[in-house]
Amino acid sequence: MGKEIVESAILSSVLVLVGLAVGFLLLKVQGE
């Protein structure tokens, strides 16, 4: 039970990090 919660938390945090990285790259590309 606890393992599933940990895995979903890790997945969501990874998705958030990926989203932030993509957004940052898009802003950087648009700024140039």
From Swiss-Prot:
Q: What is its main location?
A: plastid
Q: Keyword set for this entry? A: Chloroplast, Electron transport, Membrane, Photosynthesis, Plastid, Thylakoid, Transmembrane, Transmembrane helix, Transport
InterPro entries in the record, alphabetically? PetM_cyt_b6/f_cplx_su7
Membrane topology (UniProt): Single-pass membrane protein
TM ranges: 9-29
Its subcellular locations are: Plastid, Chloroplast thylakoid membrane
Q: Name one GO molecular function term.
A: electron transfer activity
Task: Note one Pfam family from the annotation.
Answer: PetM
> What GO cellular component entries does it have?
chloroplast thylakoid membrane; cytochrome b6f complex
- In which domain of life is the source organism classified? Eukaryota
Q: Name one GO biological process term.
A: photosynthesis
SUPFAM superfamilies assigned:
PetM subunit of the cytochrome b6f complex
Q: What does this protein do?
A: Component of the cytochrome b6-f complex, which mediates electron transfer between photosystem II (PSII) and photosystem I (PSI), cyclic electron flow around PSI, and state transitions.
**Member of which family?**
Belongs to the PetM family.
> Quaternary structure?
The 4 large subunits of the cytochrome b6-f complex are cytochrome b6, subunit IV (17 kDa polypeptide, PetD), cytochrome f and the Rieske protein, while the 4 small subunits are PetG, PetL, PetM and PetN. The complex functions as a dimer.
Q: Quote the protein name from its UniProt record.
A: Cytochrome b6-f complex subunit 7
- Organism of origin is Porphyra purpurea (Red seaweed)
